[in-house]
């Protein structure tokens, strides 16, 4: 008899594409449940999405079950590219995405195929595809040394500063040109006979006034910055 009543209660029919599984309805007073929304079968398979996994839906992150952020990798490539959230209500065989070792935080967030996402507080780099993120970090994590103007990796910053500050100031010998010597690469004007020049240890020559101004912001040879 109870079975007939249950059937009659659902006689109006479900919404198209929505599971009628009673387990998809959270129990009163219980923890939030991650229900399943089915996409009509076929190659697309099961589409699972957490109702508390999207920021901005009006749910309090502190009561949303602590949906974890981090790395999500596809366990099967046979399904579509739809969004899937961690902690689906189905069994392990129902879930096409497995949660890897990632950051554990509270709050809303979502993920896409092969992406690292840490929620609304994350930066652009956090949401980059995993195969692009290392290249992005390597090109953005360095800095330009204010002493020698060389680009230095972040993990070498301290050692580089010690070497730069302990390195003696580059010196030069002044002289007067006895003949024209081409172009000064600092001011891009000709080095003419009679000009006062500075000759560096690497034998590069510049106008003395030009190299003095250069050394105020950079302690290396303009043409040999690695020396």
Swiss-Prot record:
A Pfam short name: zf-RING_2
EC number from the UniProt entry: 2.3.2.27
Residue ranges covered by zinc fingers (RING-type): 184-225
Subcellular location as annotated: Endosome; Lysosome; Membrane; Cytoplasmic vesicle, Secretory vesicle, Synaptic vesicle membrane
Disordered: region residues: 1-42, 68-105
Effect of residue 19 to A: Partial loss of binding to 14-3-3
Swiss-Prot/TrEMBL keywords: Cytoplasmic vesicle, Endosome, Lipoprotein, Lysosome, Membrane, Metal-binding, Myristate, Phosphoprotein, Synapse, Transferase, Ubl conjugation, Ubl conjugation pathway, Zinc, Zinc-finger
Topological category with respect to the lipid bilayer: Peripheral membrane protein
Organ and tissue specificity: Expressed primarily in the nervous system, with expression higher in developing brain relative to adult. Expressed at low levels in testis and thymus.
Modified residues (Phosphoserine): 50, 52-53, 123
Molecular function via GO: ubiquitin protein ligase activity; ubiquitin-protein transferase activity; zinc ion binding
GO terms for biological process, alphabetical: positive regulation of autophagosome-lysosome fusion; positive regulation of toll-like receptor 4 signaling pathway; proteasome-mediated ubiquitin-dependent protein catabolic process; protein K48-linked ubiquitination
SUPFAM superfamilies: RING/U-box (SSF57850)
Pathway given in the UniProt record: Protein modification; protein ubiquitination
Phosphotyrosine modification, residue list: 103
Processing after translation: N-myristoylation targets ZNRF1 to intracellular membranes.
CC per GO annotation: cytoplasm; cytosol; endosome; intracellular membrane-bounded organelle; lysosome; membrane; plasma membrane; synaptic vesicle membrane
Impact noted for substituting residue 82 to A: Partial loss of binding to 14-3-3
Lipid tethering residues (N-myristoyl glycine): 2
Record's function text: E3 ubiquitin-protein ligase that plays a role in different processes including cell differentiation, receptor recycling or regulation of inflammation. Mediates the ubiquitination of AKT1 and GLUL, thereby playing a role in neuron cells differentiation. Plays a role in the establishment and maintenance of neuronal transmission and plasticity. Regulates Schwann cells differentiation by mediating ubiquitination of GLUL.
Domain writeup: The RING-type zinc finger domain is required for E3 ligase activity.
Protein name: E3 ubiquitin-protein ligase ZNRF1
Gene name of this polypeptide: ZNRF1
């Amino acid at each position: 008899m109870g079975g007939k009543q249950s059937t009659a209660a659902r006689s109006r029919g479900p919404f198209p594409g929505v599971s009628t599984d009673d387990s998809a309805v959270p129990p009163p007073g219980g923890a939030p449940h991650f229900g399943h929304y089915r996409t009509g079968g076929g190659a697309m398979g099961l589409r699972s999405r957490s109702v508390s996994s999207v920021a901005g839906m009006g749910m309090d992150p502190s009561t949303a079950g602590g949906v974890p952020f981090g790395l999500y990798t596809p366990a099967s490539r046979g399904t579509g590219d739809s969004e899937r959230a961690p902690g689906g209500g189905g069994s392990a065989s129902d879930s096409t995405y497995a949660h890897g070792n990632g950051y554990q935080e509270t709050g809303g967030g979502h993920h896409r195929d092969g992406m690292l996402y840490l929620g609304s507080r994350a930066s652009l780099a956090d949401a980059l595809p995993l195969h692009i993120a290392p290249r992005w970090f390597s090109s953005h994590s360095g800095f330009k040394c204010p002493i020698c103007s060389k680009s230095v990796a972040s993990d070498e910053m301290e050692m580089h500063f010690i070497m730069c500050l302990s390195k003696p100031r580059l010196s030069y010998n002044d002289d007067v040109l006895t003949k024209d010597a081409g172009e000064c690469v600092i001011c891009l004007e000709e080095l003419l006979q009679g000009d006062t020049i500075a000759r560096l240890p690497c034998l590069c020559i510049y106008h003395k006034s030009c190299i003095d101004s250069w050394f105020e912001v950079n302690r290396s040879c303009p043409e040999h910055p690695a020396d």
